[in-house]
Amino acid sequence: MPPTDAARHSHKNFKGLMRTLGGRMTAWGPDHATIEIDVTNKIKNGIEVVHGGVMAALIDTAGAHAGIFCAEPGRIRHAMTVSLNVNLMDNIGEGVLIARARVRKAGKTIFVSSCDVEDGDGNLLATGEVVGRYSRGSHLPEGVELAPKNTV
């Protein structure tokens, strides 16, 4: 799936684990996010299928991003995961993982996202739920001012 403009921007900003796993945002907008990861040897476990921790990280990242989309230039929304529930139902040893998350409910402090992980053929591999806590001001769609980068 070709990425949306917002998704393309986010991909440039993936850091840490999701960058290491090869995650790419293919859709991102108000209350939804889609992230894909190609299955490679580096994300497989000892029985040659995707490690459950990779599925959990994918659900966590997609679910969190669904809750923090901000379309305002120069602004951002922040949140942290306070609860993560993952149900592993099937697995693959090759292909692509596609995580589709959507916000089910959001308030001033907390949001809840649900996420399904499927393979490229649409077979359900995992489901999950993310409960996120917004940082101050991040519950608003316009978010907060993006902090300037330290140039020192």
Which residues does each PLM region occupy?
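Terminal targeting signals and extreme-terminal segments of soluble enzymes
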Residues: 1-152
